[in-house]
C-alpha cells in the first residue's frame, strides 16, 4: 500500500550549525531516505595521482591555479 502525502511547509528562520558531505537535512515526511553518492572529476584529471614518497621527504608542491572553476562568493558580510 502506498501513501502519497502533499505538504505545505513555511520556514521563516532556519539556523544550521554545520552540514557536512554525509549530512541529511529532512523537512517534512519521508517514508524512506535513499542514499546517493556522486563522484565528479571537477579538476579534469586524466591520470591517477602520483605515488606517495616513502622516504619521508616533503613533496614538491606546485603553485595553485589562480582561476577557480566554481563561482565563489567574495569574503565579507
Curated annotation (Swiss-Prot):
The keyword Transmembrane helix does not apply. Transmembrane segments: none annotated. InterPro entries: GerPB. It holds the Pfam family GerPB. Coiled coil: none annotated. Induction: Expression is sigma K-dependent and negatively regulated by GerE. Residues 48-77 are annotated as: Disordered. One of its GO terms (biological process) is sporulation resulting in formation of a cellular spore. Residues 54-65 have a biased composition (Polar residues). Required for the formation of functionally normal spores. Could be involved in the establishment of normal spore coat structure and/or permeability, which allows the access of germinants to their receptor. This is Probable spore germination protein GerPB. The gene is gerPB.
Amino acid at each position: 500500500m502506498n501513501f502519497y502525502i502533499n505538504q505545505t511547509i513555511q520556514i521563516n528562520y532556519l539556523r544550521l550549525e554545520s552540514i557536512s558531505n554525509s549530512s541529511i537535512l529532512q523537512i517534512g515526511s519521508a517514508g524512506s531516505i535513499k542514499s546517493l553518492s556522486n563522484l565528479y572529476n571537477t579538476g579534469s584529471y586524466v591520470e591517477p595521482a602520483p605515488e606517495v614518497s616513502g622516504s619521508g621527504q616533503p613533496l614538491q608542491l606546485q603553485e595553485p591555479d589562480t582561476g577557480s572553476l566554481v563561482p565563489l562568493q567574495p569574503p565579507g558580510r
